[in-house]
């Protein structure tokens, strides 16, 4: 049985816009552009027959999922393993950082494994954060670079094998301060 997975990052937040690096340290909310991005993502997802959404419990991911799916009958299930890494994640020596990278990846991969094993739906969306979305793609065999706000990656799982199908970008250009040349 083919199963479709749609991994997407939350829409732009004020903190993204300001160029802040905040990970899971604070609760951030979508900007007007972030809301517009989520609506565009919803247009892309509208014919994908999404049956369930798994989400980071952080408001920006839930808010993006609610807007994009736009259907109160579709359950949004939060999972703490879909939270972005903390800001202090990159501090320490190389061995400490590598261990945290491995632990973080294994946490995210175990979440995906549990969804695959326990959820019988065929069209599943996962709303999270840039680093988490990148790790999900990597767990499916695709190495992605920077993940933009509301960018979505479509994978098919068929007979235990992952296939990358396509990706969606909202086309809404936002200027995050961290994206500007120094």
Question: What do these predicted regions represent?
Answer:
Residues 67, 135, 139:
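Active-site signature of alpha/beta-hydrolase-fold catalytic machinery across serine-
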Residues 130-134:
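GST superfamily/GST-like fold recognition
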Residues 2-3, 8-72, 101, 147:
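Active-site-proximal alpha-helix that buttresses catalytic centers in soluble enzyme cores
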Residues 95-119:
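Internal catalytic-core helix/loop-beta-alpha segment
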């Amino acid at each position: 049985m083919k199963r479709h997975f749609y991994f997407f990052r939350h829409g732009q937040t004020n903190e993204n816009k300001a160029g802040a690096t905040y990970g899971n340290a604070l609760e951030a909310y979508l900007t007007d552009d972030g809301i517009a991005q989520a609506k565009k993502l919803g247009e892309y997802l509208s014919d994908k027959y999404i049956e369930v959404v798994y989400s980071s419990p952080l408001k920006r991911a839930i808010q993006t999922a609610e807007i994009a799916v736009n259907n109160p009958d579709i359950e949004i299930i939060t999972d703490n393993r879909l939270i972005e890494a903390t800001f202090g994640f990159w501090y320490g020596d190389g061995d400490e950082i590598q261990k945290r990278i491995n632990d973080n990846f294994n946490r995210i991969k175990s979440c995906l494994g549990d969804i695959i094993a326990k959820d019988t739906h065929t069209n599943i969306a996962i709303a999270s954060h840039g680093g988490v979305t990148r790790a999900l793609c990597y767990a499916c065999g695709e190495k992605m670079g920077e993940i933009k706000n509301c960018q979505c990656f479509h994978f098919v799982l068929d007979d235990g094998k992952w296939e990358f199908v396509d990706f969606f970008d909202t086309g809404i250009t936002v200027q995050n301060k961290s994206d500007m040349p120094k």
